[in-house]
Amino acid sequence: MKANWNTHTFRCGHASGADEDYVKAAIRAGIEKLGFSDNAPFRESFPGQRMDYSQLQDYRESILGLKKKYKNEISIHLGIEVDHYDNQLEDMIYYRKEMEYVILGQHQIEYQGMSSYEIFDENGLGYYREHIAYVCSNGLCDMIAHPDVFLWAYPKLDGTVKQASAQIAEIAAKYNVPL
C-alpha cells in the first residue's frame, strides 16, 4: 500500500500550495493513504517552522472536509507533528486526544538553546535521545520523523553517534513506534 503520513501544509511556513492540491497529487500518484501532519502550534511562536494557534481550527476543518469529499478516492487522515517541550506537555496530550495520529519530529531541544540541527556534543545528543525516550515511553506519539536530524551538525560519525542511533532504534522498538 502506498501511503504518505507526513504531509505539511502552507500553515507551517515551509510548505506551499492548497490542501486540496496535495490530495489531488496523491491520487494521481496512486497514494492510497494520505496523512496530513502539519507542525503543531505551541505556546511559543515559531514563524516559518509551525502553524500558529489561530490556524489550528482551519487546519482541522480543511482536512476533515477533504477527508469527506474524497472518501471514495483516497483515505485521508488528520495528524500533527509535534516537538517535545517540558513546559508544553498539556499541548501534546491535547493533540494525542484530538488527532488521528501524532508524529514526533524533535526539531528543538532545551539544551543550551539549540535546535536539534545544531547538536555538536555528546551531552546534546544524549538530551535529544532522552526527549525521544520520554515521548515514546509515555505513549505521546505514533511514529518518529527524521530521528537523525542531529547529524546535520554533529562533527563526525563516531561511536557516540552510532550508540545514540542504536539507542533511538531500541527505544522505538521497545515502545513499538516506527521510525
Located regions from the model:
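Hydrophobic "anchor" residues on beta-strands that sit immediately upstream
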Residues: 2, 34, 77, 142, ...
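Extended substrate/RNA-proximal surfaces in nucleic-acid metabolism proteins
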Residues: 49-175
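Short, conserved active-site loops that position catalytic residues or coordinate cofactors/metal ions
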Residues: 34-47
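Short amphipathic alpha-helical segment that frequently serves as the phosphate-/nucleotide-binding helix
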Residues: 16-20
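Catalytic domains of carbohydrate-active enzymes, especially glycoside hydrolases
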Residues: 22-37
